């Protein structure tokens, strides 16, 4: 028996985009998410077998689906795979239990032509596709968003973390936000989410003196650092790049000296975060609505898990207290709409016959007290 007097009891929070594999975020993700009130989550990269193993050994009881990444040099030979190769990878992933597949365009891109082929294959076959915009031609920015929507030619897909494309890298942030809003308003077939944290998450791995991830290079460039291993080292020393430190039950951002030591000990293959997300774009995509009253971006996510930014509840309730959204709207966007986005008919609502996913919240402290899944 749980005494919930004075607490909020809401449908279990659904994180429509997180990371939990050892490749990016680590297996402490599952406990970190549960402690943040999350009861259901979509892991958006894989590798699938690593996620399965992590759930078996370190799962916290939350429900998890996984999108298998499409990554050149890993499960496709190059950045321009043909339809036959893509089909083989897609259906192999589904046969092994994947919820769908993910294009990591901002980190490990395909050509625009291959990206378009992937979108057509998935939509025509009813396969769930998540996309981080970006290609071999355009980066993870507003130009990448326009390009991937053009590539889709009206086909549906899930476009990840709308706030993360509006960091002022092409235009001023307000102009970028308006640019992306116009695209979303014109393409209701595209589902999307956004997150509420100032930090991102990426890899510090370097190959031949250059950061492997396009996102890492973008972050360095945006703040005047060289897009090299030396530039990344300087960013770590300055505290701009914060290496992830594994503690007993969580992941935290290391202080500069310790972060540099971890990065070097791991031969640069360490995950890290940069404080690159403007509050304007975070706020806008969390609250903005379409003319018909529905939210412009469908759901909240963390893009976290093992990346220490699991703040749907903490920062989402700040929006409620600020008056930007109502408590009912917070519940809708953090659970009901996310369930609809993922096709989870038995989640996102507290009704007889639905899954008994419940988050119990201390509203004053903006913290989860219990999470049942």
Predicted stretch roles:
Residues 20-21, 135, 306:
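Short active-site segment of divalent metal-dependent hydrolases/proteases
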Residues 280-361:
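His/Asp/Glu-enriched, well-ordered alpha-helical/loop segment
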Residues 83-100, 109-267, 276-296:
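Histidine/acidic residue-rich metal-binding segments in metalloenzymes
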């Amino acid at each position: 028996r749980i005494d919930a007097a004075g607490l909020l009891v809401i449908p279990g929070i659904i994180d429509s985009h997180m990371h939990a594999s050892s490749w990016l975020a680590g297996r402490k993700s599952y406990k970190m998410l549960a402690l943040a009130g999350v009861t259901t989550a979509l892991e958006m990269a894989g590798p699938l077998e690593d996620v399965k193993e992590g759930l078996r050994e370190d799962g916290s009881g939350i429900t998890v689906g996984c999108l298998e990444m499409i990554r050149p040099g890993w499960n496709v030979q190059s950045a321009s795979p043909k339809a036959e190769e893509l089909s083989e990878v897609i259906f192999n992933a589904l046969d092994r239990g994947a919820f769908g597949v993910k294009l990591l365009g901002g980190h490990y891109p395909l050509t625009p032509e291959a990206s378009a082929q992937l979108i057509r294959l998935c939509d025509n076959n009813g396969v769930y596709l998540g996309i981080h915009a970006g290609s071999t031609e355009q980066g993870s920015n507003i130009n990448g968003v326009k390009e991937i929507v053009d590539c889709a030619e009206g086909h549906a897909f899930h476009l990840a973390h709308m706030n993360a494309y509006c960091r002022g890298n092409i235009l001023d942030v307000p102009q970028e936000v308006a640019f992306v809003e116009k695209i979303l308003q014109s393409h209701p077939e595209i589902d999307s989410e956004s997150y509420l944290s100032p930090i991102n998450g990426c890899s510090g791995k370097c190959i031949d003196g250059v950061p492997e991830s396009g996102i890492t290079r973008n972050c360095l460039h945006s703040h005047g650092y060289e897009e090299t291993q030396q530039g990344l080292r300087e960013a770590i020393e300055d505290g701009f790049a914060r290496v992830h430190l594994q503690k007993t039950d969580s992941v935290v951002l290391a202080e500069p000296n310790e972060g540099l030591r971890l990065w070097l000990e791991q031969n640069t293959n360490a995950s890290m975060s940069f404080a690159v997300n403007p509050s304007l774009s975070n706020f806008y995509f969390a609250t903005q609505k379409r003319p018909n009253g529905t939210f412009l971006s469908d759901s909240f996510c963390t893009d976290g898990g093992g990346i220490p930014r699991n703040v749907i509840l903490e920062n989402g309730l700040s929006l409620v207290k600020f008056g930007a959204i109502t408590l009912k709207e917070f519940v809708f966007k953090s659970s009901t709409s996310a369930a609809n986005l993922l096709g989870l008919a038995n989640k996102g609502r507290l009704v007889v016959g639905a899954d008994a996913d419940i988050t119990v919240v201390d509203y004053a402290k903006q913290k989860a007290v219990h999470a049942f899944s």
